[in-house]
Swiss-Prot record:
Function: Putative tyrosine recombinase. Not involved in the cutting and rejoining of the recombining DNA molecules on dif(SL) site.
GO molecular-function terms, A-Z: DNA binding; tyrosine-based site-specific recombinase activity
InterPro entries tied to this protein: CB (IPR044068), DNA_brk_join_enz (IPR011010), Integrase-like_cat_sf (IPR013762), Integrase_catalytic (IPR002104), Integrase_recombinase_N (IPR010998), Integrase_SAM-like_N (IPR004107), Tyrosine_recombinase_XerD-like (IPR020876)
Entry's localization field: Cytoplasm
Residue stretches making up the Tyr recombinase domain: 92-248
Superkingdom per UniProt: Bacteria
Family indicated by similarity: Belongs to the 'phage' integrase family. XerD-like subfamily.
Organism for this UniProt entry: Streptococcus equi subsp. zooepidemicus (strain H70)
Residue numbers annotated as active site: 213, 245 (o-(3'-phospho-dna)-tyrosine intermediate)
Any one of the GO BP annotations: DNA transposition
Protein name: Tyrosine recombinase XerD-like
Keyword set, alphabetical order: Cytoplasm, DNA integration, DNA recombination, DNA-binding
Gene3D superfamilies: 1.10.150.130, Intergrase catalytic core (1.10.443.10)
GO cellular component: cytoplasm
Length: 248
């Protein structure tokens, strides 16, 4: 079925970002169901989306349904299949923050810069402004640490083995900044645009730099870090703003 993805995309008028997102979702779908498209394989595919947000789930189902209709029109499929993409809304007086399945953040992508920005927020809790100021000299990939200097002092952060390959690829360039624009950092808006394009490509358009930072907090809390330790990792003067995460 993978062979039909490009002809399907060519039949639609899609912006480049949307086309990348469609391609990612459809390759994921084809890898899961293989050549057998039937009610059973589609049900298993739907079940695999259960951990996603409602918006991401609806987007993936809509994309796959369009693809299934295309395959039926092209007589690749003898029967027309359509998955129910209606997502029941759930309401709560108090929004509940939960840890997300972030495996898609580490998958192969065409949006490499946006991916690295997302991972730096997700794994280290950095803000876009802090990321903009990162220099290659701040990293010691051999010792797997980042030394981030600010007016409040130096924060030493451990780089995970999962993050390391993404940094090693970026460090191959001979430049001053991790994200370098003629030996100067890019604008803050550039970082938000790169992050947005990547998040859209993996079906997580509803996420933001702030929500990824919240994931970092939740993950550190789940790992047993105290509120004081997380505040120090984030470079905060006080842990007051973190109290809501520890009262959950």
């Amino acid at each position: 079925m993978i062979a039909f993805i490009e002809p399907f995309l060519a039949s639609k008028s899609l912006a480049n970002n949307s086309q990348q997102a469609y391609r990612y979702d459809l390759r994921q779908f084809c890898q899961q169901v293989g050549q057998r498209i039937n009610p059973e394989t589609l049900a298993l595919y739907q079940q695999s989306l259960s951990s996603l947000t409602a918006a991401a789930k609806k987007r993936k189902l809509s994309t796959v349904n369009q693809f299934l209709y295309y395959l039926y029109q092209q007589r690749v499929l003898a029967d027309y299949f359509k998955m129910d993409d209606r997502i029941e809304a759930s309401f709560s007086l108090k929004p509940q923050l939960t840890r997300l399945d972030t495996s898609a953040f580490y998958a192969e992508t065409a949006f490499l810069k946006g991916q690295l920005i997302a991972l730096l927020i997700l794994e280290l809790g950095l803000t876009p402004s802090e990321i903009a100021g990162l220099r290659l000299a701040d990293f010691d990939l051999g010792l797997q640490v980042l030394r981030l200097q600010s007016h409040r002092g130096i924060r030493v952060m451990t780089l995970s083995r999962t993050l390391l390959p993404f940094l090693e690829r970026a460090a191959e360039a001979q430049q001053l900044y991790l994200f370098d624009h003629d030996a100067k950092p890019f604008s803050r808006q550039w970082f938000f645009n790169q992050l947005r394009d990547f998040l859209e490509s993996i079906g997580c358009a509803e996420l933001s730099a702030q929500s990824l930072r919240e994931q970092f907090i939740l993950n550190e809390k789940a790992a047993g870090k105290s509120i004081i330790e997380v505040a120090q990792l984030l470079g905060l003067k006080s842990p007051i703003t973190l109290e809501k995460y520890y009262k959950m």
